[in-house]
Structure formats: C-alpha cells, structure tokens
From Swiss-Prot:
Residues 1-31, 117-173, 193-232, 682-723 are annotated as: Disordered. This is Zinc finger protein 438. Its main location: nucleus. SUPFAM superfamilies: beta-beta-alpha zinc fingers. The gene is ZNF438. It comes from Pongo abelii (Sumatran orangutan). It is found in: Nucleus. A zinc finger (C2H2-type) spans 506-528, 534-556, 566-589, 775-798.
Amino acid sequence: MQNSLSVPPRDEGESNIPSGTIQSRKGLQNKSQFRTIAPKIVPKVLTSRMLPCHSPSHSDQVNLGPSINSKPLGMSTQNYALMQVAGQEGTFSLVALPHVASAQPIQKPRMSLPENLKLPIPRYQPPRNSKGSRKKPILIFPKSGCSKAPAQTQMCPQMSPSPPHHPELLYKPSPFEEVPSLEQAPASISTAALTNGSDHGDLRPPVTNTHGSLNPPATPASPTPEEPAKQDLTDLSGKAHFVSKITSSKPSAVVSEKFKEQVYLAKTMTSLSPAILGNAVQLISSVPKGKLPIPPYSRMKTTEVYKIKSDANIAGFSLPGPKADCDKISSTTEGFNAATKVASKLPVPQVSQQSACESAFCPPTKLDLNHKTKLNSGAAKRKGRKWKVPDEILAFQGKRRKCIINKCRDGKERVKNDPQEFRDQKLGTLKKYRSIMPKPIMVIPTLASLASPTIQSQMLGGLGQDVLLNNSLTPKYLGCKQDNSSSPKPSSVFRNGFSGIKKPWHRCHVCNHHFQFKQHLQDHMNTHTNRRPYSCRICRKSYVRPGSLSTHMKLHHGENRLKKLMCCEFCAKVFGHIRVYFGHLKEVHRVVISTEPAPSELQPGDIPKNRDVSVQGMEGSLERENKSNLEEDFLLNQAGEVKLQIKCGRCQITAQSFAEIKFHLLYVHGEEIQGRLQEGTFPGSKGTQEELVQHASHDWKRHPERGKPEKVHSSSEESHACPRLKRQLHLHQNGVEMPIENEGPQSGTNKPRETCQGPECPGLHTVLLWSRSGFNCLLCAEMLGQKEDLLHHWKHQHNCEDPSKLWAILNTVSNQGVIELSSEAEK
C-alpha cells in the first residue's frame, strides 16, 4: 500500500491535481525551508496550494523546491484546488476528479488569491523584528481566550496517543472555519498547512467553507462554543506541530512526513497522503500526534500550538500579521521561553504582570502556563518562583517603605507620573529615574515598553488588549510610585503644619484669634476693653492702635502741613486742633463761639451777604482738609466781614471779642482770668481768627436753631451788657478815666457818632480809633499818622504811664478800629 500510495502521486502528480495536493503538503515543508532563505517564494506556493508533487520520499522532497518555484508561476491554482474531491473516495489520493470538478474551486481560489498575495507582505515584516516577536508572547500570553487556551493544551496530548480522534476532527467543519481565519491573517504557509489537512470524508464542503467563508470565520473564532473551539484548537495544534517540524530542521520534517504516512496506513486510511495535502487542517494535526512523545519537539510544539491558537484568536479580532510563519513561530517560542525566564528572574514586573493577568483575564491562562511549564524542563523551578512571588513582593514593599521613610526625613517631594508619560519616557529619562527610583520600579516600564511595540507589530486588536494589560499593570506600579511620591508630601505638609502652628503663638481668649506677636494681641484686646492708650499729645485725641495715632499725626500734625496752635484765652492751654479748642471752651469755660452777627448790627442787606460768605468759606474748607492757598487768601480777605459771636453759657450774653467776655466773666460771674493781655498773644490775629470763623460758622450751620435771634431779657444787666463792659473798662483804667471826663465834649464834638437804631442800644455811639487816614486819639481830637506817634502823644500829652497797655485794651474793645461808647461815659 505504501508503494501504491507513493507511485501514483508521482505519476499523476505531474498530470493530475490530487498528486499535486500531496506534493503541496511536502512543498510546504520545503517551502518553510526556502522560506528562511527566500521568503518571497511563499505567496506563490500559497496561490498554487495543490502543486503536483509525488510520494513523501526524500528525493521527491528535494525536487519539490525547484518544482514549486517553476510551477506556481505557470500553473493555475484553479486546477489544483479542485482536486480535493479525491479525498472523498477514501481509497487513494491519486485518483483525482475530472477537470470539470476543478472548475468549481477555481472561482474560490480566485477570491483567496489576492488575499494570499497580500498576506505575505506583513508576514515578512515580523521576521525582521524577531526580537519583538520573542517579546510578543509575554503580553500575548493573556490575550488568548480563557476557554480556548486550556482546550489547546488538553487537546494536544490527546491528539498524539489516540488515532480514532483523527476521523472526528476530519468530520467537523467548524474548526475548518477557524482555520481559514488563520489562512487569511497569519500567512501563506499557515494557510497551506491548513488546507493540507482537508477532511477525508468530505473534501469539497470544507473547501467551500475555507474559501467561501474566509472572512466570516474570523469573527466567530472568538465567540464559538467550547466544543468547536477545542476542535479548532486541535486542528491548530496539528498545524503548529507540522510547522514546528519544518522550522526545527529539514530532515526532521522529512522524517515526520514519512512517519505520518505510516501512521495513516496503519489506521487504514488510504487517502491520508492526499488528504494531508488537501485544504483541511485536521489530517495535519494527526501527524504531530505521533511526534508529540518526543520531549524536545513536544516543548517546541506545545509552545507553538499555544501561540498559533492565540494568533488564531487574535486573527478573528485584528488585521493579518506574522502569525503562522515558521521562522517567526520558532523565534516567538524561543522568545517566549526566554522572556518567561527573564520575567521569573525579575520579581516585581513578574508579580505585577501575573496579578494583572489574573485580574483582567480568566484563570485558564494560568492553566496554560502550568501545562506549558510541565512540558518544559524548568517547570518545577518556575512554579517555585511563582510561589516565591509574594515573598518578593513583601521584600520589595519593605524596601519601598524604607525609601519612603528616608524621603520623609529628607522632606523631598516628588511629582506623580502618569502611565502615558511613563510609556513615552525615553531611555535618558529612565536612566535619570534609575539613579533616583528603586530598581524594581525601573524594570516595569522597560517591560511595558518592550511589550507594546510587539503588539503594535502584530495587530490592532492585540494593541487594545495590551492596553488593558498595561492598564492593569500600571495601577500597581503607579501605586508604588504614588506611595513614594505622596508619602513625602504628608511629611512636608506636616512640617508646614507645625510651622503654621508655631506662627499663632498668642490667642485671644475672647474671640479665639491667633496673633504672631504679643503686641498685636494687646492691641487686639484693647478693642474688647474699649481702652485707648495711644493719645495725641497735641490735641489729646486717643486711639486703640499705634498705627491710627501715627496716621493721625501725619494727617493733622505733620510737618508738611501748616499747623496753627490755638492758645486758650482763659487758661493759657495750647491746642492743635480747632475743634478740640472749641470743645474745651464749651465744657470748661462755658463759652460758645459762633459767627451769627449781633442783633445790634443787623442790617437789611448785610445778613445774607455775611452769612453767604461765611457759609461758602466754611463749605469749601469742609470739603477738603488740605485747602489751597487761594482759598486761604479768600478766607483771610473775607474774615474782616465776618464777626465772631462769643456767648456766655451762663447768662446767654454775646460778645464780639474774648476781652469783653473775659471782663464779663471777671466782673459779673467772678471768674478769674489767668491769661495776660499782651499784644500779639490775643486770638484776634488774622490766622487764629480765620480758623475760629471757619469752625464757628460750621458749628452754627450744624445747629441752625442757634441762628434765631435771642429773646430780649428784661433785666437791665443783660440789656446794658456792652455799655457796662465799656464802663467797667474805663473805670478800671484810673489814669484814663479823668481825661475822658474832662475832654469828653471836645472828643464828642469832633468825632463822628452813630447811634444804634433800636431799643437794645439806647445812648450808644461809635468812636473811630484808627482808620485809613490815621490814628485818632480818644482823649483829644488830634489825628496822628502812625501808631508810635499816638503812643508818644498819650504818654506826653495825656501823661499815660503805659500807653502800650492802653492801646491793647482799646484795640481789644474796638471792632475794626470802631469803639462804641455810651452817652454816660461821654459825659
């Protein structure tokens, strides 16, 4: 049977297409060999899936390479693809269907041809990045479906010992649908291997499934139930084993083919050789069953099968990539083993990855790892390392805590790094963090950075899953970093809190306010006790805080502002503020000052004029405290027109000067006057009188009821207040009294007199003491040009002992040089 099987494929392989199917199977092996040398040939072989090749002898395999190179160019894939019907006979693969039957599959390979041609392009790119593919299994590991991964591991051992499972695999088309997904996405070699494993019983229907529904099976690959998934996984495992043989060594592949044919003959399956070269994957999976007992190959096969399955699952989600390439698979398996070893050596990243995989994915992934490690030589050690992982975590946490404590002591704050920033960091920045951060923290970003490019090279769906893995890994890693960065922050805040607590040394027991300085607390307590310890030495105004007093001194008593000290006419006290002076006069001496004109001087047109002038001047002064020189000059010019009205607070008698009120207080109320009447010391000067007029008018404006005319008192003392003052003044001056009496008629006749119109001033007349023309002598009718001449005249002509004192008295009594004298004094 072996010879018959081998001879007819040789004869009919050249003429008939079924032998081409047989040759295509071996061509795949040789193709894997040439693939390493010249990968561009792969797409051509895929297009001519059923190349005419003969028995699995070594010589045929050697000749397959050139035949494959020449025939796919000239031969049409339609004829070869149709020869899969030969498997339905079940007797011999050499018996092929007529060319009429091949016309049907011709259309199907047309659909697959452009796809196969496009597939090898991405296939060549990943083998260039062999390192990336080696890194790939680390992250691809969790990507595989939870249910599919254990199924793969379980089915692979079952395939080898049990031959009866082989027909079951051939009979089911569902794995067949998943296989084409690998045909499109993985590569041309994988598709050829898948097609070679066509069913013995039904070859055409699986062909229709493979070619007709290439795209649909890609999607159901993931959601298929467990049973079809297992079958598909078994088919894939068979393919993986077959591909691994090709990748391991060419002679091994040849031996495997011979062994496969023998196994099939023993199983009484005459059509095994053509079926293997058919489009179904199931028969190919049976061949690795025999090879599984070999320990070295079994390791590679299991890893490759697992990866092919993961690639198949990924193919249902993502774009076509380097999935079934022989070189690539071998590199990925080696990379997977190496990467797992490295990961086991690295404690922190391994723990984080495994924990992330456990949390993000199903536990079957763990089962796959356990099964895989059992097949591998270092399984026990890896398990031990896995159990040691918690210890490593504890050690790492202890180191991290120590670092945190040291950082807290140093008071250094570190900024939190986002996971994206972490991925985007360059090697230079990583080196910087190596010097700063602990080593385990450095390892995780490197693994993440290595894993991310491999997934990007494979597929977009893989990228999404890698993002999930990275996200699952990053929280723990970031948690470590956040602990490192956030832990010093509380320490710094704690210190700042201490510094903040130290600042409020003093607390107010009333309102619980804190103050840094004791003096501030004392000033604050004055607000609760209404105590004003800071008083102005000039105006006696008190304040709670020293700052208020300094402000007051700058505003009211500063050097830049001209201050006029006010001297009290009764007690000789000095006041810097006019209002304080007025308050003193009112409270102590019972004297009220205002600008209301006396009733004796009331005239129809004078009252509004004088009041308007005084009010205007007062309003201007109130609006601005720092008045300009123009306003001062205006007030100085208008001060002569405004007359002060000084009232006695006891008897309501008004006087126009302080001298009159002094005499009134002295002779009527018996109050002693402490001040001396000296020239230049009286408040009748222009500056002082100006301020008096200003503030008195303001005070009168605020109290308009004071502007009403006083009621006429019946007492003779009040009605004749002014004449009595004059009389007392003249009587007080003994030296002047006699000359007045003697020379009264002369002076009365020479000086103009004006009688006061009204009942209040009967018998009063005015005498001019001085005017623009000169100074008049009250004792005689003589007029002198200067004041010195008048004083000399009084001294020599009228024998006056102190003419300056007499001038001061007359000047105080007079109002703008006008002296009012009664008729009695004149007599």
